[in-house]
């Protein structure tokens, strides 16, 4: 007997769009001389004493085993001819905004997961197009024609399958998973490909002899619940292609922040305040983008010895004024005890967010 009822809504039309090696692709687009060469977005370890991590890399660099979150030093060791680019995140944000505007032509039910991926529910779309595959192809065409970048698309009746489908054929792929094909599609996948199944869960599943979707499908519900608790039921549903999570166009953000890690330690107050200012302006811009205001400003400081301090101040009124955020963050820094160690990271975050209110001054 099932512990939890199985309800499978297969009537929806969900698209998952994932930009192909987004940051690196933007750099290649803007500098054609990079095409065909291994490009890594991250600090050049030869200039930072080996510090830094890879943000992302293009497909040419991935041939050498380079991947995001790898240390820049290891990336260089794997591919000494790789071209390291620090990255221009303001430019990437601008391009991301351009792509989101393309999504909005087709549906307002868009759930951005990051700057380079999003879910779209096109069940009831603006153009009245019945085929989700046709919409996915149109979006790919529009992004290529107007932005000069490629993306991969997954189409299915839920978010779980759509995301798996977008990963199936990259770059510039389009994969459709119909309800009648879902079990066959999942059966062939390694369990570590299932989104939402973390490393520890994968190890535990392997210990149970579960390596593929087919293996998972054969395990009784109670066995999974005994081993994983409520997550066991989620696994039971995933193996059957069941996921009714809605595309949330109004995802609730609890905070908006900006932080930077410095290859060269900061010692001078003028340099520190200048970086606080940059972060504050970035936070103000993000608040503007997301039509949010906030009340609590948080400053994060990490020193050379990796001691990390965070301190917050709650304002009497909501704001997204860059000058005010900068002033408060600067005052917080002034209130901290002096530390002779240089600073390796500074971050400014706004919490206690609310939607924009018309009669509040929003000057940046």
Curated annotation (Swiss-Prot):
Record's subcellular location: Cytoplasm
SUPFAM superfamilies found in the cross-reference section: DNA/RNA polymerases (SSF56672), Lesion bypass DNA polymerase (Y-family), little finger domain (SSF100879)
Catalytic activity, reaction form: DNA(n) + a 2'-deoxyribonucleoside 5'-triphosphate = DNA(n+1) + diphosphate
MF-aspect GO terms: damaged DNA binding; DNA-directed DNA polymerase activity; magnesium ion binding
The protein's assembly and partners: Monomer.
Active site: 117
Site (Substrate discrimination): 23
Organism: Streptococcus pyogenes serotype M2 (strain MGAS10270)
UniProt-listed HAMAP family: DNApol_IV
Cofactor notes: Binds 2 magnesium ions per subunit.
Protein name: DNA polymerase IV
Major subcellular location class: cytoplasm
Presence of the UniProt keyword Mitochondrion in the record: no
Any one GO BP annotation for this protein: SOS response
Function of the protein: Poorly processive, error-prone DNA polymerase involved in untargeted mutagenesis. Copies undamaged DNA at stalled replication forks, which arise in vivo from mismatched or misaligned primer ends. These misaligned primers can be extended by PolIV. Exhibits no 3'-5' exonuclease (proofreading) activity. May be involved in translesional synthesis, in conjunction with the beta clamp from PolIII.
Keyword annotations from UniProtKB, A to Z: Cytoplasm, DNA damage, DNA repair, DNA replication, DNA-binding, DNA-directed DNA polymerase, Magnesium, Metal-binding, Mutator protein, Nucleotidyltransferase, Transferase
Keyword Transferase: yes
């Amino acid at each position: 007997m099932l512990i939890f009822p199985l309800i499978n809504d297969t009537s929806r039309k969900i698209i998952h769009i994932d930009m192909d090696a987004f940051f690196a692709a933007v750099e290649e687009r803007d500098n054609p001389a990079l095409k065909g060469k291994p490009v890594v977005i991250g600090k050049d370890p030869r200039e930072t004493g080996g510090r830094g991590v890879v943000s992302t890399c293009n497909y040419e660099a991935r041939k050498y085993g380079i991947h995001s979150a790898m240390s820049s030093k290891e990336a260089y060791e794997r591919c000494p001819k790789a071209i390291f680019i620090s990255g221009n995140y303001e430019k990437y944000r601008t391009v991301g905004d351009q792509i989101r505007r393309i999504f909005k032509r087709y549906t307002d039910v868009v759930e951005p997961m990051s700057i380079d991926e999003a879910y779209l529910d096109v069940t009831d779309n603006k153009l009245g197009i019945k085929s989700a595959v046709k919409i996915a192809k149109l979006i790919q065409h529009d992004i290529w024609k107007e932005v000069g970048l490629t993306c991969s698309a997954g189409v299915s009746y839920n978010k779980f399958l759509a995301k798996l489908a977008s990963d199936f054929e990259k770059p510039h792929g389009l994969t459709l998973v119909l309800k009648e094909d879902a079990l066959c599609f999942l059966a062939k996948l390694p369990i570590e490909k299932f989104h939402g199944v973390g490393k520890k869960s994968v190890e535990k599943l392997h210990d149970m002899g579960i390596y593929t979707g087919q293996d998972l499908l054969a395990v009784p519900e109670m066995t999974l619940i005994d081993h994983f608790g409520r997550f066991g039921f989620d696994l039971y549903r995933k193996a059957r292609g069941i996921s009714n999570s809605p595309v949330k166009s109004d995802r609730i953000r609890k905070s908006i922040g900006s932080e930077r890690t410095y290859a060269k330690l900061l010692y001078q107050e003028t340099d520190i305040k200048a970086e606080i200012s940059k972060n504050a302006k970035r936070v103000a811009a993000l608040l503007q983008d997301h039509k949010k205001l906030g009340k609590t400003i948080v400053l994060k400081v990490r020193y050379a010895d990796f001691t990390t301090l965070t301190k917050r101040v709650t304002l009497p009124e909501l704001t997204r004024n860059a000058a005010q955020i900068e002033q408060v963050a600067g005052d917080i820094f002034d209130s901290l005890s002096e530390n002779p160690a240089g600073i390796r990271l500074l971050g400014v975050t706004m919490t206690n967010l609310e939607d924009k209110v018309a009669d509040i001054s929003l000057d940046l």
